[in-house]
Amino acid sequence: HFVATSPKGHTLKVRAERQLMMDAKNLMQLVYEVQSVNYTGPITILSLLRGGEDADQWYSLMNHVGDDLCWRWMQLQPMNIQLCCAMSCQLKKNDKLVVQRPIKIEKQDVIGYSIAQRIKPGDKLTLCKKVAVVDSNDYAKDHLIDHAIRCLTNL
């Protein structure tokens, strides 16, 4: 938890929380909250999956960014392990679900969504991001995508 103040004096309260799912070892949930103290205007929240810091250690086999979820299937070098990361997210404004198509992001090292909302003092945006990670140590390589998506959708 922290408070951020811009050079113009606009203040936001920010909170981030990671929740591990004990009954689903491949799944975690990240919750981000941004609350306006004295700011009126647009807020953009990015929900992203990155490939990794060391681009020569991995390469993307296939990416997909859909309306409800995105996934990245990767090969890790030199270990010859494949993994699939899948992500879904929901945005709430003042505890009410925002029904809005996010802007899709698909680049070489990052995929995901950008979601913007206007806020005023007292408004709270909450982004709930679910991430599933499965690898070829536990699943057949040709079923990684299906298993990652199933982790997200069978909650």
What is the predicted function of each stretch?
Residues H1-L155:
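Acidic/polar, glycine-enriched structural segments that form the non-catalytic walls/loops
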